[in-house]
Amino acid sequence: MNNTIKLIIAIAIPLVIGLSGGAFTAAEIPGWYAKLQKPSWQPLSWLFGPVWTTLYILMGIALYLVWKSDAVQSARQTALILFAIQLTLNFFWSIIFFNQHQIGWAMAEILVLWIFILLTIFSFGKISQTAAWLLVPYISWVSFAAILNYTIWKLNS
């Protein structure tokens, strides 16, 4: 498989997962989510889509750099497994928070997600420093999202 195809696939994977998770989110924004008490510093709702799209593209490029690398198979395999775990956790956070309305459980889940993103960054860094750095905006945004999740949880408990 040539590198162009690998790049397209690598970017498509997080985008498709993200859009799938977004399907659970979109329906709840005007109803349940709009009724929640939220902090004054929460970003405008329209900002989340472009931010997540950008992050999913960066994740895909990072995935591509690891996938195409000549790193030892075991290191690459570990990195790809960690990436898959964090991407799965990313998907399920939307379901837990928006679809199931379980803000507390979503808080617990996002902490586990954060740990797996960090493990993925370290694992990617052993293979490609660029790939690791491409995930820094992602963990930064998830850190912010965790603080927002916690604040919404406390405001609505």
PLM segments and residue spans:
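Helix-adjacent hinge/juxtasegments
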Residues: I57-S94
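Membrane-interface helix termini and inter-helical loops of multi-pass transporters
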Residues: A27-S40, K68-Q73
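N-terminal signal-anchor transmembrane alpha helix
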Residues: N2-F24
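Membrane-interface helix caps and helix-loop-helix hairpins in membrane proteins
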Residues: Q73, W93-G104, K126-Q129, W153-S157
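Hydrophobic alpha-helical transmembrane segments
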Residues: T4-I8, A12, A79-A84, M107-A108, ...
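Hydrophobic alpha-helical segments of small multi-pass membrane proteins
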Residues: L80-L87, A106-T120, Y138-V142
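Membrane-interface loop-to-helix entry segments
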Residues: P43-L58, Q102-L113
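Terminal transmembrane helical module of multi-pass membrane proteins
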Residues: G125-S157
